[in-house]
Amino acid sequence: MALWRAYQRALTAHPWKVQVLTAGSLMGLGDVISQQLVERRGLQAHQAGRTLTMASLGCGFVGPVVGGWYRVLDRLIPGTTKVDALKKMLLDQGGFAPCFLGCFLPLVGTLNGLSAQDNWAKLQRDFPDALITNYYLWPAVQLANFYLVPLHYRLAVVQCVAVIWNSYLSWKAHRL
């Protein structure tokens, strides 16, 4: 409980920084889970640079983009009713999710040194499956998130659920 209270105080004092650092930390954790539990690399074969890249993407891309998106979404649909939550989820999943994945996957490919041609081929191969998999998890999570969770906690809630999603994304993005 003391850790949670400290997190809440930090979030109140420095909301943007804490949200971005939370996203980065949990993206890094997702990659560790991907490498150790999904890919079963073992500690000797663990690619620390890859984990650092994913954590950096969390801080430099995921945290700012998703955190900013939630602010925009709350301005576009300011209410907190069930209908408002449904509208937010539909806009999030119908508009934002495809755009986010369409940027995230090639960004990882670029950071991994893929050529533009290879990156495009990888995006065409991986995007449909990643988007379909997204729709198995995120609509229900986001509906609850938009209805039950205050704006300043949404990114943290999503990133906690996203540890598993990040493991999947890391595996998908690093699979050649």
From Swiss-Prot:
Role of this protein: Non-selective channel that modulates the membrane potential under normal conditions and oxidative stress, and is involved in mitochondrial homeostasis. Involved in mitochondrial deoxynucleoside triphosphates (dNTP) pool homeostasis and mitochondrial DNA (mtDNA) maintenance. May be involved in the regulation of reactive oxygen species metabolism and the control of oxidative phosphorylation.
Keyword Amino-acid biosynthesis carried by entry: no
Gene for this chain: MPV17
TM spans (from-to): 18-38, 53-73, 94-114, 131-151
GO terms of molecular function: channel activity
Localization per record: Mitochondrion inner membrane
Keywords annotated in UniProt: Membrane, Mitochondrion, Mitochondrion inner membrane, Transmembrane, Transmembrane helix
Protein name (Swiss-Prot/TrEMBL): Mitochondrial inner membrane protein Mpv17
Top-level taxonomic group: Eukaryota
Main localization (coarse): mitochondrion
